[in-house]
Amino acid sequence: MLRGQSLPWRAALHQTPRPTVLRPLLPFARNNGPVRSNLSISRLSRSPSLSPRAFSTSSIRRKEKPPSDEKEDSNLQEQKDPNEQKDSDRSPEGRRRSPDSTGREPGAPTSASGRRRDKVAGEKEQRGVEEDAKKENVSIEGKSDPTEDPSPIPVNGGGSSDTKSSASNGGNEDGGRKGKKGSGDRALQKPSVPEVYPQVMAIPIAKRPLFPGFYKAITIRDPNVATAIQEMMKRGQPYVGAFLFKDENADGDVIENLDDVYDVGVFAQITAAYPLRGEASGVTAVLYPHRRIKISSLLPPGEQSKAGNTEDKAPEKKGDVVASFEEGVAEPAPKDLYEPTSFLRKYPVSLVNVENLAEEPFDKKSAIIRAVTSEIVNVCKEIASLNPLFRDQISAFYTDQFPGNLSDEPAKLADFAAAVSAGELHEMQEVLEIMNIEERLPKALVVLKKELMNAQLQSKISKDVEAKIQKRQREYWLMEQMKGIKRELGIESDGKDKLVEKFKEKASKLAMPDAVKKVFDEEINKLAHLEPAASEFNVTRNYLDWLTQIPWGQKSVENFGIKHAMTVLDEDHYGLKDVKDRILEFIAVGKLRGTVEGKILCLVGPPGVGKTSIGKSIARALNRQYYRFSVGGLTDVAEIKGHRRTYVGALPGRIIQALKKCQTENPLILIDEVDKIGRGHQGDPSSALLELLDPEQNSSFLDHYMDVPVDLSKVLFVCTANVTDTIPRPLLDRMELIELSGYVADEKMAIAERYLAPAARELTGLKDVDVNLQKDAIEELIKSYARESGVRNLKKQIEKVYRKAAFKIVQDLGEEVLGEDKALTDEGKAAQEESKKETEEGDPKDPPADPEKSTTETPRLALKVPESVHLSIGKDSLTDYLGPPVFTADRLYDTFPPGVTMGLAWTSMGGAALYVESILENALTPESRPGIDITGNLQPVMKESTQIAYSFAKSVLAKQFPENKFFEKAKLHMHCPEGAVPKDGPSAGITMATSLLSLALDHPLDPTIAMTGELTVTGKVLRIGGLREKTVAARRAGAKKIIFPADNMSDWLELPENIKDGIEGHAVSWYSEVFNILFAELDKDAANKLWQKQLAGKPKKGPLEEDD
């Protein structure tokens, strides 16, 4: 079926069919030689009454004659009057004869002999064209023409529903049933189409225009237009004009305004009309276009005007040619214009005055025309190879439209290309309007190319869909066959069904969110349709396993008891007041609200103060599950966010693994060493922690492997770090910092007695043995072996003491008391005998024959030490267990010489004493040049503090001691001991300035005074950090006084009394206060005149002066 046509047009195809001669479609090559086509040919019946006619008017006639058959002429002459025969031979209607010379009615069945006669008639018809072209060279003006007859033109068999002849020749409306062979007169009757029809009823059409020679079925719903069509059919004048709407969405059967439609359309014949189903007034009309026409004026519906009115004139386009292009023919005087549609004035329909459009003359041998024609034929072949229906259309079109050579009908070929294509509205209309064949053919080729692309796309989609359907049908068929075979053989299933049921059972016990439930259902359906041998099966199974092991909606019952939490925390840790207070606050809030949200805490402190171990105690106090993982040195983001499932061996991140292990949504997760996280080519894990540790985001944490949101808002995160300098600022901002300072000697003593010593005794097997580590020994151990702020090294030293004691006990008692045979059980003795036997049979140098048996741990019993054993470890015997003390002295100097001061520093190990030494490199002389050298592995900030202190010291000496010229001539050297330890920070400013002034004033300082504070060039003392650690270091170094900035007074007040015990604190704001404390006993007059003797000598003479 042609595009845009409906079922009724098939009936019109068989109105008055004629047998045609089948010819192959012949494309043309560049040498103009015919090439045989492989395109298949199918037969098509086409009514000769509906074939396109040559254009003419009342005063102009075409020069060409249609082909005629000699036999037909002779037959007609026998049946007609000679005069009539003479006139009819000259008229175009008389020359158009039916090629059927057998006398049978068109549409009757054709026998084999009839088909042979058809072939002979076709050959004669082609020869007749050539003879007529030679003979017919005279004008036909003045001859009789049916179109000049003012009476209505009858249409016999042209679609009239009430003519008797239409029923006899198969031209009725029932779809063209073949009628019986009628009489010879009736067989020779044929309808005629007027070449001039100045006024027609205009019917607007939508979507695509009509092209001459191609049927189109349209639907008429306007009752007036439907009634007019029926009237036209009854009168035998079923001719209308079809014009395309400019608006694709427009609808209607009447043209209200000439601007609504294109002015170029087609003159069409209504071959059949059928009433619409379900509608009383509507009809479906089948139109057959004959030629192109152009609107000259519009008579709006209901207007009673004559056809001569020229209102709403349509603009005339360039290239529009009216009537024939024959030259040298004189036009007769105009006659009164016949109006065949005058009976339609009573209906409110659209009447238009039209004029015929004729094609411009063209050269059939033009290279452009031949090339484009050949390309159109090639494209048609390609489309035909993809679409069988299009192949039938091409065959029917060639059989019907091309009785001669294909190159002789390029205009029809262009119309065919546009008629069967699905182009744009304006493109199709352009093909209809263009009268120049060389311009029309490329336009039609473009439209046909688009149809080729559509056909290719449809073919591809059809093949893909068909392949998918076949694949699914094949899989389904095979699966059903396999199930049937297993069922017949009684073979059990592969376990997939049980696996699916297991996952569904697990999921039913979990409170999955809607988004997770949706993903679970999709994955379980995928698993059910996968074969166990498929690689995707294991991936899906592992994913479902992880998805069902996450504790969706499962929480542990928390304990909000304050007393219980205090008891648990004190059992495991001594001190750590800040941490314990924060956890108690957390519990109190949960007790009041009834629930608690997850928090992110960060414990910052030196090593060994209990940051990691306190996390486990917090989980026990809150009755939460505990999970710890370290991120120190971590460089792969996938450890936190997981791997994508596309990778082999992919796993979720550590957070999802923690939830799987804890089986609760509210565990305590300890992220250790967060300040030592790394960065590599696999990403920045610290940036991945931003989402994890953000309370606003972790409620929908997205792991790469799980790819579903996981709620972490109820998890209590505890991070640990030694320093905060290496933690990115955005990450640090998301955590609540709790600083843990180092332990003082008293705290270490309590920790050692309560926790470390009992644990070490049990670890070394001395739990039930009378081994006593005296208190003075622990004090000496803390003082001389473990000065660190933490207790990790102290724990090591205590364990070492007990190990030495265990060795001493075993050695003293001997093998007689603690024999090996007493330690073995019966199983152990049997294993020992078997091992000994195997050793004797084999070479002693050979490795064991059965490594698994030989390396298996032999069952043993713990030996009991006799109660008579007593061991006491005191201060004096500590060297026998631990060796010489590591720290031999608390301070470097018993008394300070001039230029030496004791400062205080903060390190990751806690606080430490920082000594600053300044000396005079050379003796002072008038020729001396000032300067200062700095050593001690000082970092940039501390070097700047040295320059500030040097400049400030010179300023103080110049103001308060103007006669002292020490800094003007002194070459100085400043050093900070322990040069292997890098030192940085601004807090040693007042210490350095004091060291320089002590040397310049030659005044030694009190060795029991320690100081810390940042100094500016104007003498202002600024705030410092780590006052607790520095105070502990000062106390350990034997300091009695400590000078610190006044801005740190609040930190000083918060220090425990056991730390401040025996130390006097002095808060200062300016260095003048520091000077008054340190140099209170200084003789200012003597200090002012100091160094005058050294600088008063005469300068040495130069070499020239000595010669004189």
Curated annotation (Swiss-Prot):
Residues 161-171 have a biased composition (Polar residues). InterPro entries: AAA+_ATPase, ATPase_AAA_core, Lon_bac/euk-typ, Lon_lid, Lon_proteolytic, Lon_Prtase, Lon_prtase_N, Lon_prtase_N_sf. ATP binds at residues 605-612. It catalyses: Hydrolysis of proteins in presence of ATP. GO terms for biological process: cellular response to oxidative stress; chaperone-mediated protein complex assembly; mitochondrial protein catabolic process; mitochondrion organization; oxidation-dependent protein catabolic process; protein quality control for misfolded or incompletely synthesized proteins. GO terms for molecular function: ATP binding; ATP hydrolysis activity; ATP-dependent peptidase activity; sequence-specific DNA binding; serine-type endopeptidase activity; single-stranded DNA binding. Residues 24-192, 299-318, 821-862 are annotated as: Disordered. It is found in: Mitochondrion matrix. Residues 1-62 form a transit peptide. The keyword GTP-binding does not apply. The active site is at 987, 1030. Residues 78-103, 119-146, 174-188, 309-318, 821-855 have a biased composition (Basic and acidic residues). Residues 895-1081 form the Lon proteolytic domain. GO terms for cellular component: mitochondrial matrix. ATP-dependent serine protease that mediates the selective degradation of misfolded, unassembled or oxidatively damaged polypeptides as well as certain short-lived regulatory proteins in the mitochondrial matrix. May also have a chaperone function in the assembly of inner membrane protein complexes. Participates in the regulation of mitochondrial gene expression and in the maintenance of the integrity of the mitochondrial genome. Binds to mitochondrial DNA in a site-specific manner. NCBIfam families: lon. This is Lon protease homolog, mitochondrial. It comes from Aspergillus fumigatus (strain ATCC MYA-4609 / CBS 101355 / FGSC A1100 / Af293). The lineage of its organism: Eukaryota, Fungi, Dikarya, Ascomycota, Pezizomycotina.
